[in-house]
């Protein structure tokens, strides 16, 4: 069998991935999982034609109205977030309703981090994520964010 010579694979270089765009996504009324998967796709750069898995070519995302995200079904009363304080018997559990009142940005961040690769590249891509309570994002005006409807 003869090898095809006209097939070419384009691989992006790190220098080509320097022009990063920023997007603003409103989480008000959105389902947590669907919102998180779209944000993770943008952070990784999978929405671009030139996507290359080993290059950090994702864009930045600003999520506003984090406290207005919702869950489907009975998860609102059943979902529990666990964390460890570092001390003996330091395992803590916080219900979704308490967490959304105390720290709404953690809920979205936890969901998105679970969808990202657990590598050095994944950790670097998560640094381009900003989650805000409320709809005021004027501190990121210099990035010229594009409002994105997900």
From Swiss-Prot:
Keywords from the UniProt entry: Ribonucleoprotein, Ribosomal protein
InterPro entries: Ribosomal_uL13, Ribosomal_uL13_bac-type, Ribosomal_uL13_sf
CDD domains according to UniProt: Ribosomal_L13 (cd00392)
Single Gene Ontology BP annotation: translation
Transmembrane segments: none
GO cellular component, one term: cytosolic large ribosomal subunit
MF terms in GO: mRNA binding; structural constituent of ribosome
Primary role: This protein is one of the early assembly proteins of the 50S ribosomal subunit, although it is not seen to bind rRNA by itself. It is important during the early stages of 50S assembly.
The protein's assembly and partners: Part of the 50S ribosomal subunit.
Sequence similarity: Belongs to the universal ribosomal protein uL13 family.
Protein name, entry field: Large ribosomal subunit protein uL13
Organism: Chlamydia abortus (strain DSM 27085 / S26/3)
């Amino acid at each position: 069998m003869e090898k095809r010579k006209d097939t070419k694979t384009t691989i992006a270089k790190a220098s080509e991935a320097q022009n990063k765009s920023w997007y603003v996504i409103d989480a008000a009324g959105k389902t947590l999982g669907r919102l998180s998967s779209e944000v993770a796709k943008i952070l990784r750069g999978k929405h671009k034609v030139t996507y290359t898995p080993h290059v950090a070519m994702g864009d930045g995302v600003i999520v506003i109205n984090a406290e207005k995200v919702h869950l489907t079904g009975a998860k609102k009363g059943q979902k529990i977030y666990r964390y460890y304080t570092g001390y003996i018997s330091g395992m803590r559990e916080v219900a979704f309703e308490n967490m959304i009142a105390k720290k709404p940005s953690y809920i979205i961040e936890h969901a998105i981090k679970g969808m990202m690769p657990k590598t050095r590249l994944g950790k670097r891509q998560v640094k381009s994520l900003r989650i805000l309570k409320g709809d005021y994002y004027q501190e990121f005006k210099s990035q010229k964010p594009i409002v994105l409807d997900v």
